């Protein structure tokens, strides 16, 4: 009775379980669909839907090709083996039991096994969509490899594809063979009887043909390997490419082995017909022996007994190939080498011919002044500036000025915790801030040429709102009718910034969320029910996400390696992020492989092929084909037509802000450390290696170097140039060994980074590399040695101790710049002082200069240059008009903002009275009078609504009060 009643209960639960499973599957499917559909909306809004569909189309097509190419042969192999099984096979008891277990599942297994392998094969094949599209759209490069005389496009586009196809086909044959053997064994077509193996005729034919196909594929693979020798490392990794033993032993050997493999394949086909296994077994053994003798032993013998005794002379032609290919692949072929016999003598007027360079020496360090930008220009806690700012240039009053720039972005951690605040109210940053790189105020602050809220300065009118930046919120929902309520916080306004201005996004920056379905899609994508439920979202709302400039470029141009350091510029009335994109390969014949960009990737070819811009207001991405000779870029232009614009479409203003990328330069300097010489003997012996010095200003807690010295942007005139150009430079020193470590300069590398300002035409010398080579017997100190000289100089040490005020302030050393001027090498390092308070910021108080073995430590760069060149350098610096304030006891001006204002403008404040050893009462009164005047000016500025003037007056008021307090303490 009990068992009878239980059966209906179990039956009644079955439909419920099935229904639940179906619902769960539908929910999961909809989640997956939501992700795909959100991608479609994002790409479609940006105008790059074709990129996504091409990726998906190629991936899906390759998936089905891979699935069918694996599943069909495996299925056919198993089916043929099963259908040709012996009818009355003699099976042992164990096989009989296996059959009893398998037989009920046989039909399912015969379909499931090929399908499972097909799925894995499809996924693997789809991941090679880039390789396949490159092969289908391959473009000749016009250059040939020196060994086989093939166009380098064969190695860049064809050889990787052929290897992948042969490897995939080999995997298909192996899995098919395993299926044949397993089926034949289970059903008695292959039997082990003692020492004998009995194979039925049908199985023999199938196994032999399958083996023949496999060896035929191995012959093709071995044949292709001879071409791979010119892109593989040789001589124990000393260089990339085919060396003497490769050319004279390995390549001929592989040709022979490929022929033997084909012969073995024919032997297996013959066996399928005649039924004798002896012949292919002997052939297989012969192939193995030949592989050992011809493929391994013979090249080793040639290397050991022919090459090593005469290695330098025999390998010399192949090192020449390696040198030529490496310099071509990394853009070093046209480098101009200039011998530079640097002097260390200082004479009056030595810099007169370099006056244009000294006037452009940047004393503002973008890696240090981030906190100064924050304290002087942040204004509100919900804004922030990055730690490392960027270097750009603008034409001010007819003169191009190097500047340090940053975007005032939102600080996501200070926008409140409510969903409305984080995603509807705090949606964007505000404006670009720029400071002169060559100037400072009298108290060491940056001199801003564009600053404040609302933005004002020398850059003219531009759209200041920054919806897309490096620190933008993960997503924001913006937009609405012009007549509706404005909910997006724009910027602080009113007296003391007590009021706030609101705005509504009016651009086309993200997918519309104008219906319930799209809101549901994005609620699932971002796992936030508020997107679906919020009443503030209307039919004109847009959702902005994936807002990082580098990320946006990487998504619309998936074939690029994207520079991770975009920089902002004001271009044609908009703030835009400029992003560099690189095409790379590891298949350039004979070019040396390196790991410069990503530690896990090896490359031996790189081009800065694309310049991209991302509009900071609406996120629009524009790609420009920059290196029109790059065959990889040409190929991708065929894959994604109409996604890249020609150089002719670049405006003159945008062109003036494009620069040679630092990441590309780092790759080139790393390669040039070895390949600055063109003599094969020097490359072979590694006798003249160079390396980049460590950054003397970046150390770990243990005092050891933390990183290599970065390249620096400067406007300067190098030897070989007829006028100063915006440049990027780096220095070289000998590498340290176990016995020696010489901190002397061996080379100075500079590249012309100025693209010009002509619309649609880059400057003729853009990207021109110049290498100053110093004589080996010169002992020009390198940056690390100069830093040691600064630190050990008694006068410098005493003044630094005064600046540190017994621990109440700290000294921050800025970037140590090296300039080839005055017939030698000039070192310049700004010195900043900041208090130990949480709200302090660095002030530029001193400048260190070195030339040869002489050191100067002065308040301004202009004074330091005169000091080091015996009172008259013959040139002026950008800070020549600065009259620094004199800190009391070396103490004032530490950048503390305790009780200070929201920010400053960078205009030179009225200097407060200087303290004397025993400050008289009139000095205190003068300071109080200055404070009273500044207070009245602040009140007047607020009354007129001039926030910039109010901030300036507020800063002067605070400084005067602080000065009065310090003077009163000395009485």
UniProtKB/Swiss-Prot annotation:
GO terms for cellular component: extracellular region; plasma membrane. The keyword Cell membrane applies. The chain crosses the membrane at residues 16-36, 56-76, 108-128, 161-181, 205-225, 255-275, 281-301. Residues 687-702 have a biased composition (Polar residues). The keyword Membrane applies. Residues 884-900, 907-921 have a biased composition (Low complexity). It is found in: Cell membrane. This is UPF0182 protein CMS1887.
